[in-house]
Amino acid sequence: MRTVFVDCRWELGAPARGRELYLEAHIPGAAFLDVEADLSDLSVENAGRHPLPTADRFAAAAGRAGIGAGTLVVAYGSLGGAERLWWLLRHFGHDDCGVLLGGLAAWGGALRGGEETIEPAEFVPHARTDDTIEAGEIDRRLSDRTLLLVDARTPNRWRGEENPIDDPPGRIPGARNAPWADPLPELPEGELVAYCGSGVTACVPLHRAWLEGRDGRLYPGSWSEWSQRGLPLERG
């Protein structure tokens, strides 16, 4: 099996920064996939800030990165970019993938700058239907004690304090806080659902739970969709 490294670094509010960092230094041979251009479809309206890409869109991006049958993908990044790629790969049927925990800083080998010549591959998507949840189902099940909602945003955003990202601020009623940058807290039993601001950092607690043998679902639209639909919210 061939190993493919993929750099998924990005910065919220600075779309070009991820590629700039990649060009400065990356794991030799690594491809680059952009969270907003490749791992999202920003043309989709009313679905949050980072809607999921279609199967065809993701397949094209994955193929450009050299991902296909017989490849083991190792993703690294920042702000949940690597976990977003991990989640999308599994969502579209490619389970041979992992995340370099600690990101590029954990890589002990040489680095290289500039562009890479990546041999393209054919990525054939086979989308799962059991790993996402939509706002309507969550709304209907807010009083369902078997649904375990986890909010991956920072504590101040989870509490609903004023901040420059969430408008309006708040959280989905009943959601527990599991900040993406912290270790996964101990969670009770239940049907795990993760969300964040836009469906990127929510993939971090899902990945950590998976490492512990627990599957969960992603709410792709997350708070940036929920908050615009007039649905219930909590603060404090």
Task: Report residues per predicted region.
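Cytosolic catalytic domains that perform sulfur/thiol-centered chemistry
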Residues: 1-236
